[in-house]
Amino acid sequence: MGAKLLQYDEEARKSILNGVNALADAVKVTLGPKGRNVIIDKSFGAPTVTKDGVTVAKEVELEDKFENMGAQMVREVASKTSDVAGDGTTTATILAQAIYREGAKTVAAGSNPMDVKRGIEKAVAAVVTELKNISKPTKDQKEIAQVGTISANNDETIGNIIAEAMGKVGKEGVITVEEAKGLETELEIVEGMQFDRGYLSPYFVTNPEKMEVSLEDALILIYEKKISGMKDLLPILEQIAKMGRPLLIIAEDIEGEALATLVVNKIRGTLHVAAVKAPGFGDRRKAMLEDIAILTGGTVISEDMGYKLENTRLEDLGRAKRIQIDKDNTTIIDGAGERAALEGRVKQIRAQIDETTSDYDREKLQERLAKLVGGVAVIKVGAATETEMKEKKARVEDALNATRAAVEEGIVPGGGVAYIRTLPILEALKLEGDEQVGVNIVRKALEEPLKMIAANAGMEGTIVVEKVKEQSGAFGFNARTEVYEDMIEAGVIDPTKVTRFALQNAASVASLMLTTQCMIAEKPEEKGAGMPGMPPGGGYPGMGM
């Protein structure tokens, strides 16, 4: 184990602050409708141009080990917010920077970090409650389109397409984003089914960049038990290998020799195969396998029904036009099942929904129904160049996540106004000693997103904040038109979930950094010098060189 470097107290907090500032300053230029672009150099290919906070955050790596720790902690805020709420990454980064910057000052001035942390936590809890009070449910497709538009950096086409997709497949439906062949961004509704099981081995992956498996015109073997030996599988695999078609195996589990053999054959290219575990548990698993069989026109190979794995015939296999699998989900698109059988199944599930008394069962049955009926909406993103395509696709994915969040928890006025409207709650929150310092830190931090949006639009942030504070409700500063107006009427809205998560994640990481007393990093290795006693020039003395 190599030697370590240590930093304590003030020195450690200073390093963290430098790292936090380096990352946050790069990310926050992208905030708001007038936010700027960031160009990122790639080791191969053209540079990436982006206005997406989390993409910028993921690229920041600092030379100083201690400063880099600070930057990585804030990067965690951005990616966690992106993963859970789908948007709000830049806002979360700005809040984390503001809370930590103010907090570090107060700790340096002698405040107790633990008390400050408790104060921050209480303030955040109060703000979250108030955000939920301000929040309004999304009423119609128009509001959903507005959320999508804002999140896609004011691209109305994207907002409208997402709203249309949600209208077509419903809240429960599955929406995926793909690259289009042409220049236009369009929406395609595909009948398909998605379940939450990913590939059993990363060796099945066909697209290493995205870590996804894509099978075109595939066969599907549906088996309800575990497969561990190869003997029973061989007869059907040999027939499929001759046909040269891709195969997806869905079983309770595939392990040991069976999994190893499939992986080896996939790597050698003899079999184009992937395997996933069956979704659900117990009786629900049987029902879901039956759903998949009906959707794809296959049969569940189940010993209860008198089928044996070794006797499986090609006609027992399901078929689908396309199957996509990532590490968490499998989507079967355009199954070859008969329409009549599918309609019968849907009718049966609807009857069960009406009869069941358990809320949990009803929820699960509705999920199954959505998977059979809802289908999959595919948003095909078109662009002129590869660079533009990547940037646009990232925006569509952001916007999609934001709209989902809006449908889930409702909306609040956008443009940093919602945070300003929670300030009176913090004015009224009176705590003891250094806990009050924590509340004041959060109060100051909540003004930062609006300040930054105004600053990126070329305005004086503090003046804009004061003007917005004087008014109430959804009144705020619309940076796109540079007009003070009712944000909700102007269509500048944010999902409550995004606004809430950005603050919670920022405060959580910032208070962790505040209560850091010591940092440990690897000592960088000295650059190897020449051998001792070697004369300059590299030759040995007396060699007549």
From Swiss-Prot:
Residues 536-545 have a biased composition (Gly residues). Keywords: ATP-binding, Chaperone, Cytoplasm, Isomerase, Nucleotide-binding. This is Chaperonin GroEL 2. The gene is groEL2. It catalyses: ATP + H2O + a folded polypeptide = ADP + phosphate + an unfolded polypeptide. InterPro entries: Chaperonin_Cpn60_CS, Cpn60/GroEL, Cpn60/GroEL/TCP-1, GroEL-like_apical_dom_sf, GROEL-like_equatorial_sf, TCP-1-like_intermed_sf. It is an enzyme of class 5 (isomerase). It is found in: Cytoplasm.
